[in-house]
């Protein structure tokens, strides 16, 4: 069994569709007052970075124990356009509580970073404060991708649709995706190569994507400047910020300040 198959099986086993839980989510959604526009943030001036709060990962193991709210506040102060919060507990040591706590701490669009395989997870994302949800094409059938993408938009959330190949990008765009994330990390081997973005970004823009985000493996300002030449609109950066002794200064450096 490959890594994504293992993850999918685990995620499906964790889905709670009980009437009581769905009512709880509906109540939390009704109570939510603040929403932030990710697409608008992607049209702002300057380098656009989605900064990630990530305590661990399958490729890195434990990275750093941090207070998610404090880390997110540093990112906001430094100039991130959005914050990505890992909510997966098993592989990334995250939680929905981390998402809720970050929501109460910053006034930026929030991405629920998780392996989304069911509509309940999208309800959770909205209930706990996300404005953006991650959909990984490689994990989903065409039917599932379309249903989850449409459901996200019906709830007023922005789907960030992640791809690793041009065929996956075509599937995403056929399903109606506007924001495509190119993962420079192969989720089966965990190998990282930012040339993946150089290879795919111009082609994906030519196919009609509104925005293209480069994800994973970016740690230097020079890499960002280089990738900007390939029609990249934004960058999702986690590990290099989490490993930094001064994440505020590191993010400023990546932004060009």
From Swiss-Prot:
Disulphide connectivity of cysteines: none
UniProt key word ATP-binding: no
Record has Amino-acid biosynthesis as a keyword: yes
Protein name: Indole-3-glycerol phosphate synthase
InterPro entries associated with the record: Aldolase_TIM (IPR013785), Indole-3-glycerol_P_synth (IPR045186), Indole-3-glycerol_P_synth_dom (IPR013798), Indole-3-GlycerolPSynthase_CS (IPR001468), RibuloseP-bd_barrel (IPR011060)
Family matches, as Pfam families: IGPS
A biological process from GO: L-tryptophan biosynthetic process
Family: Belongs to the TrpC family.
Gene that this polypeptide is encoded by: trpC
Originating organism: Aquifex aeolicus (strain VF5)
Reactions this protein catalyses: 1-(2-carboxyphenylamino)-1-deoxy-D-ribulose 5-phosphate + H(+) = (1S,2R)-1-C-(indol-3-yl)glycerol 3-phosphate + CO2 + H2O
NCBIfam families assigned to the protein according to its UniProt record, in alphabetical order: PRK00278.2-4 (NF001377)
SUPFAM superfamilies linked to this entry: Ribulose-phoshate binding barrel
Enzyme class: lyase
This protein's UniProt keywords: Amino-acid biosynthesis, Aromatic amino acid biosynthesis, Decarboxylase, Lyase, Tryptophan biosynthesis
């Amino acid at each position: 069994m490959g890594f994504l198959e293992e993850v999918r099986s685990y995620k499906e086993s964790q889905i709670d569709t009980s009437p009581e839980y769905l009512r709880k989510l509906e109540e939390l959604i009704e109570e939510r007052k603040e929403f932030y526009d990710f697409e608008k943030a992607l049209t702002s001036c300057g380098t656009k970075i989605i900064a990630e709060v990530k305590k661990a990962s399958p490729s890195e193991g434990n990275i750093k124990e941090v207070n998610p709210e404090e880390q997110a506040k540093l990112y906001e102060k430094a100039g991130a356009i959005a914050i990505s919060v890992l909510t997966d507990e098993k592989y990334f040591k995250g939680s929905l509580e981390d998402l809720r706590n970050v929501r109460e701490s910053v006034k930026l669009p929030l991405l629920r970073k998780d392996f989304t395989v069911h509509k309940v997870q999208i309800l959770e994302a909205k209930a706990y404060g996300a404005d953006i949800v991650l959909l990984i094409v490689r994990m989903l059938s065409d039917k599932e991708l379309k249903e989850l993408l449409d459901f996200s938009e019906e709830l007023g959330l922005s789907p960030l649709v992640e791809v690793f190949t041009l065929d996956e990008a075509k599937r995403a765009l056929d399903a109606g995706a506007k924001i495509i994330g190119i993962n420079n990390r192969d989720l089966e081997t965990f190998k990282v190569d930012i040339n993946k973005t150089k290879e795919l970004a111009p082609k994906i823009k030519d196919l009609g994507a509104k925005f293209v985000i480069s994800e994973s493996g970016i740690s230097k300002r020079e890499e960002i400047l280089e990738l900007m030449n390939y029609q990249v609109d934004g960058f999702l950066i986690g590990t290099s910020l989490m490993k930094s002794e001064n994440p505020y200064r590191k993010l400023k450096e990546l932004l060009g300040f």
